[in-house]
A protein has these predicted regions:
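ALDH superfamily catalytic-core signature
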Residues: 1-125, 188, 237-240
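Conserved C-terminal structural/oligomerization subdomain of aldehyde/semialdehyde dehydrogenase
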Residues: 9, 63-64, 74, 90, ...
């Protein structure tokens, strides 16, 4: 696995409460420092405003703090270098013309640590860097797509192909999404994060090298097959008749 820019597509018929919970956890869990973290939301215009309102309200309730504090909801970036990367991308988003809805700063009371408030941008176009490049922090970009075809076009437009999710109640939309999305893992009505040890893990395009981790595929990747013939019968002629 070599990077990701994972999207959640939210269609007009989606359960918005479930979608918001999934996006929230996928984006801000582990401070967004997961290869499968949600960093893009591609939403239908009929429901985008309601979805964004939910996401902003949930993000603003997150309590920042030490990972050793059980009352904390989200910890810091892993180190100063990564914190600087995240803050630089927030600056890029502002410069590109995206609308900062919440977050984007380090709280004044937390200058001692590499903390970043949960950050949500709206009005993000597929040409913007914050839409295309991996940030690896608690930053979410929201983009409007008028149809499933357009949503898939936007989702597939980046160089990465790790994981994507869709929220919809339409089975035809689900199957079209599964067939056409260019990622190694797909989710339906659940977060982009998470995996199972018995299932292959990995991506397409610049995300991976073509092989998968875990499951039988992972075993095959990390091992070599050796064919062994042993004649334990004590009969020399038996091996000649094989």
């Amino acid at each position: 696995e070599m990077g990701g820019k994972n999207a959640v597509i939210v269609m007009a018929d989606a359960d918005l409460d479930k979608a918001a919970v999934a996006i929230h956890g996928g984006a801000f869990g582990s401070t967004g420092q997961r290869c499968t973290a949600t960093s893009r939301v591609i939403a239908h215009p009929d429901i985008k405003a309601k979805l964004v309102d939910r996401l902003v309200a949930m993000a603003e309730k997150i309590k920042l703090g030490s990972g050793l504090d059980q009352t904390s909801d989200m910890g810091p970036s892993v180190d100063e270098k990564q914190w600087s990367v995240v803050m630089d991308y927030i600056g890029v988003g502002k410069a590109e013309g995206a609308k900062l809805l919440t977050g984007g700063t380090r709280p004044d009371s937390m200058k001692h640590g590499f903390f970043v408030q949960p950050t949500i941008f709206d009005g993000v176009s597929p040409s913007m860097r914050i839409f295309k490049e991996e940030i690896f922090g608690p930053v979410v970009s929201v983009t409007t797509a008028n149809s499933l075809d357009e949503a898939l076009q936007f989702a597939n437009s980046v160089e990465y192909g790790l994981t994507t999710s869709i929220f919809t109640e339409n089975i035809s939309s689900v199957m079209k999404f599964v067939d056409e999305v260019e990622t190694g893992m797909v989710h339906v009505n659940e977060p982009t994060v998470g995996g199972e040890a018995q299932l292959p893990f990995g991506g397409t395009k610049s995300t991976g090298v073509g092989e998968r981790e875990m499951a039988e595929e992972g075993l095959n990747f990390f091992t070599e097959i050796k064919t062994v013939f042993i004649n334990y019968s004590g009969n020399a002629e038996r091996s000649m008749t094989r």
